[in-house]
Design a protein with these regions (language model features):
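N-terminal compositionally biased, intrinsically disordered segments and leader/signal-like regions
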Residues: 3, 17-18, 653
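N-terminal accessory segment at the very beginning of proteins
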Residues: 25-251, 255-260, 269, 274-276, ...
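Bacterial N-terminal signal peptides that target proteins for export
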Residues: 1-11
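N-terminal metal-binding scaffold of metallo-dependent hydrolase/deaminase domains
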Residues: 6, 23-26
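N-terminal signal peptide c-region/cleavage motif recognized by signal peptidases
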Residues: 15, 19-21, 571
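Catalytic-domain carbohydrate-binding cleft regions of carbohydrate-active enzymes
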Residues: 27-29, 126-659, 664-665
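Generic detection of short hydrophobic beta-strand segments and adjacent strand-loop junctions
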Residues: 627, 651-653, 774, 787, ...
Length: 803
């Protein structure tokens, strides 16, 4: 395990020191410019009370840091990994102001009196400081001016509405047990604000505080923090795609998860024995419900909920042959995941070892800090000590070599984290928001050293800006098993995707409460088909697994799982796009709706990838649902019936029991597969390629990404194939082309495509494949044309259809 230091947090200054420092009383009116120095890319502005460093990372990203007089620069960032590039920029002194302009991008203007920094992008005003770095009410603060009508997003995982302007958010990762349709504070609090003007401000400091999105209704974005770095980055974009690319380029992109992560999980709180776990896996096979992983909650290391946390080893009474069990599951294509927590109870088997090896956080005297919480009297692993990191990683490594495939990190806010507790790099309050982030880093770096060819699966309940680069799979916490709980989930996932964490998902069916509601369960699973991870999970009083529900419910749930597996090629492809560009899997309508007057700022309908429009049913007994079809001039087809809908229109549709309303964009290519019992059996050799034809689409394109599903960095190593599709339509002739890009280290795969063209109104006059007449089938009732494209390596073909 690496001993590389985790970035050290600046220690919190004593209140007496702060009150005497220049920062304590500095306001814009008192801050005066004293000089300007340009050092390569960085612009240094001296003031009477400190200095500013303005540093471009690219033409669209600029970082601003204030260093009060008497303090030193703290260059360490937990969030930022992008290396600044050399940019072409000009500096002009216009007497009353300085303008530092980056060619083709952001310009920074510094007004001299009163001192004020503002930002523009390509000549258009973006955002400006309203009140510079200062101190008020026991916090270090900075304020920005907002325009009327400007919407704000971000601040982590919340459930308050898509436009979060008007709220003041605490920055303190915290579990909210049993929340439903509303929660202002959850497990991921992130110091980032995104604007409808397509810019983001990231406050590069994980210490606890507040992010105020104009709660006082005075046009102010206000950041308040107990101490630490006074640094923020402004990211600008021409479009939402561009902004997502910029922000994730700054903070890191999510590596592609293993393919099995897009399958179905069996999970509950929890399986209490090896025999029970084996029976559950057997039941999925018997019911022909696909399964790729089983997750073991805390009973894997102890027989009781309380008193055993921190054992971090198999309870051999209840799991006597754990390694054999996991090997048997693996042979069936089912992976095993186990829960781990950062707490070591004083009653656990490892307590004495943890104390002796000095792996725990301490009190002021340097002794292990112990305290009571729900699970018992405990200490907390200090991952900021080399001893703590190495000790914990060695446990992971041992479990991994025994057969564990993935990790569930629970309670990682940390759930109870007393302010008096000390870590190696600072107080609990200084590291609290970044603890889960650095926990994921510990596992990711351990894999890079010991298992460099494998993709880790790291399911975490808490994190920070940039956690996605460690492969973190976030979930939305202990949501109530209620309709209100379901209603909040789309917003949480959409917002987190905009903040880089594109795999935010919920416990399907809801977690908290002994509620048996089959309709709620089915609707949640139907939504789950179109969320990043398909993982039913709940308290054990009511079964979370479809195999243990009523027959009618089981049938509907099976259909949802089958559709999830059929969509594996499409889902894996949009996950690859997320790795490459940072675009989230779930996307708000505003990403594609150009008209701000339209109702695109809603979470009740969203985009899945670039092609699907999804409206989950979130009310019991719903007989109607509103769907806004974005982008006037576009056409959307009902995924289940083929009915066409025009874009730019808000419609009321009638839901059916078998599925939720889902639509596909005209011009979309959707690769799908035959359903398999486990993704291990997916080969990618036979693909159903659905193309949604419409006369309004003159040209379109799509792709299929494929690799072995398990090798870390497969694309970068050239171990991949991309099959690209394109279409043109003119003079009643539709042409669809296939061409394959094979990576330098990939052996070309022989693939056959069943091309299925939707919305064909009459039987074609002729169909050719590579210039030769081809057989086809035409379903006049469904308006569906099917053409077989023969299997070949490095697939390259041209299909021409005369309509």
């Amino acid at each position: 395990m690496t001993n590389a230091p985790i970035p050290r947090l600046a220690l919190l200054l004593a209140a007496t020191t702060l009150s005497a420092s220049p920062l304590a009383s500095a306001q814009n009116a008192e801050r005066q410019l004293a000089g300007v120095t340009r050092n390569q890319n960085t612009l240094e502005i001296a003031t009477n009370d400190g200095r500013y460093l303005i540093k471009p990372y690219s033409s669209t990203i600029v970082e601003t840091t204030f260093i009060p007089r008497g303090e030193r620069l703290d260059p360490a960032s937990h969030a930022v990994i992008l290396a600044p590039v050399q940019v072409q920029a000009t500096l002009e002194d216009e007497g009353g102001r300085l303008t530092y302009a980056i060619d083709g991008g952001i310009s920074v203007t510094v007004d001299k009196q009163p001192f004020r920094i503002s930002y523009a992008y390509k000549g258009k005003p973006l955002v400006a400081e309203k009140r510079g770095f200062g101190r008020a009410g026991g916090h270090e603060t900075i304020e920005f001016a907002l325009e009327d009508g400007e919407a704000l997003y971000g601040a982590g995982a919340r459930a308050v509405g898509m436009n979060r302007r008007g709220h003041r958010f605490q920055l303190y990762n915290k579990a909210h047990y049993g929340y439903a349709e509303r929660s202002e504070l959850l497990n991921y609090t992130m110091p980032v604000a995104l604007s409808s003007k397509k810019y983001a401000i990231h406050f590069d400091n994980p210490q606890i505080g507040w992010l105020d999105f104009d709660s006082r209704k005075d046009g102010t974005l206000r950041y308040e923090v107990i101490g630490g770095r006074k640094t923020y980055q402004v990211v600008a974009g021409d479009s939402w795609d561009h902004l997502m690319a910029g922000y994730t380029g700054l903070t890191g992109r999510q590596p592609l998860p293993p393919r099995w992560a897009f399958g179905n999980f069996a999970s509950r709180f929890g399986y209490k024995s090896e025999a029970e776990t084996r029976a559950v896996v057997d039941k999925f096979a018997q019911e022909k419900i696909p399964l790729d992983a089983v997750i073991l909650d805390l009973y894997w290391f102890g027989k009781t909920v309380q008193g055993t946390m921190g054992n971090l080893d198999w309870d051999r009474d209840t799991f006597p042959h754990a390694e054999k069990m996991m090997a048997d599951f693996k042979a069936r294509g089912v992976k095993t995941l186990v829960v781990t927590e950062p707490f070591v109870l004083t009653t656990s088997k490892r307590w004495d070892e943890a104390v002796q090896k000095k792996v725990l956080a301490t009190d002021q005297a340097g002794k292990p800090y112990t305290y009571d919480f729900y699970f018992g009297n405990t200490g907390l692993i200090d991952i900021y000590k080399p001893e703590g990191r190495d000790w914990w990683w060695n446990i992971y490594s041992t479990l991994k070599r025994g057969g564990v495939t993935g990790w569930w990190g629970d309670l990682g806010e940390p759930e109870v984290h007393p302010s008096r507790l000390q870590h190696a790099t600072g107080s609990a309050d200084q590291v609290h928001n970044v603890y889960g982030h650095d926990w994921a880093r510990l596992i990711a770096e351990g894999y890079q050293q010991e298992f460099p060819n494998e993709r880790p699966f790291i399911l975490m309940r808490a994190g920070y800006s940039g956690s996605q680069r460690f492969g973190m799979i976030p979930w939305s916490g202990d949501v109530a098993r209620s309709w209100g709980g379901l209603q909040s989930q789309m917003e949480i996932s959409l917002q987190m995707g905009m903040q880089g964490l594109a795999y935010m998902h919920s416990d399907l069916g809801g977690f908290a409460g002994a509620v048996l509601d089959d309709e709620l369960y089915v609707r949640w699973l139907q939504y789950g088909v179109f969320q990043p991870i398909f993982r039913p999970h709940a308290q054990e009083a009511v079964a979370s697994e479809p195999v243990f529900r009523s027959e009618a419910t089981r049938v509907l749930a099976r259909e949802a799982v089958w559709l999830r597996y059929a969509m594996l090629p499409y889902n894996y492809t949009i996950a690859f796009d997320n790795e490459q560009t940072g675009m989230p899997l779930m996307r708000p309508l505003m990403f594609v709706e150009p008209d701000p007057a339209q109702p695109a700022e809603r979470s009740t309908t969203y985009l899945w990838g670039p092609d699907f429009l999804v409206t989950p049913i979130v009310q019991p007994g719903a007989t109607r649902a509103e769907v806004y079809f974005p982008n006037a001039g576009s056409v959307w087809f009902d995924f289940h019936t083929g009915q066409a809908h025009k874009g730019g229109i808000l419609e009321t549709v009638k839901p059916v029991e078998a599925n939720i309303p889902v639509y596909v964009r005209a011009g979309a290519f959707v690769p799908m597969a035959k359903v398999v019992q486990t993704t291990r059996d997916y080969t990618g050799r036979e693909i159903d390629l659905h193309y949604y034809h419409d006369a309004s689409v003159a040209a379109s394109s799509g792709k299929l990404y494929d690799d072995d599903g398990e090798t870390a960095g497969a694309y970068a190593q050239g171990k991949y194939e991309i099959v690209r599709f394109d279409s043109t339509f003119a003079d009643k002739r539709l042409e669809i082309g296939f061409r394959t890009e094979t990576g330098k280290a990939m052996q070309a795969k022989e693939r056959a495509f069943a091309l299925k063209v939707h919305n064909v109104q009459a039987k074609p006059r002729a169909v050719t494949v590579d210039g030769r007449a081809a057989r086809f089938t035409f379903n006049a009732q469904q308006h569906l044309l099917e053409v077989q494209v023969p299997a070949r390596k490095g697939q390259a073909a041209q299909v021409a259809i005369s309509l």
